[in-house]
Amino acid sequence: MVNGLIAYLLSPKAEELRRHFIFRIVPMLNPDGVIYGNYRCSLLGCDLNRKWDKPNKYLHPPIYYAKNIIRHLQQERKVVLFCDLHGHSRKQNAFFYGCCYKNYEHEGRIKNAHLRIIPLMCCQKNELFKLKGCRFRLERGRESTARVAIFKEFNIMNSFTLECSFFGKENNVKKKAIDKHDPFAALKQ
């Protein structure tokens, strides 16, 4: 996913984006765990995506320092998008988990509509993205995830988790078949 994102951002298609935005990409935050087969947990057995609300400098250093990067960037200019990239083990396609404002008065409804613009644009531009898989909530038990902690602490409205299925997109007869040996082949296109 990150390779595809970087390739796109460096392509002529993203020239206009590069003119208006500065992109900061923090690579994999759990390399030690992944090397030993843990895609969620560090070598200490900590699910690092559940430590974003109060990361410990010594127990969760990748999260602690990633938040420091965001804090530093916020001092320089407004951060308009935070996106945590994940692989999903059950659902197919690509989809976003986002946040929402609890104020359902007029202003809250407008802000909540704005939160859906980036996912909607992705769905319109790429058949791998499915709006029906997207969720925009502040659920119990998710307060310590990256998207929720960043949304609340830094007031970054566009704070998302982008999930891409380990199994590719839904197998639809009208669409290309999924390469079962490389489920991310379609994402690289």
Language-model features: locations:
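Structured catalytic-domain cores with a bias toward divalent-metal coordination
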Residues: 1-189
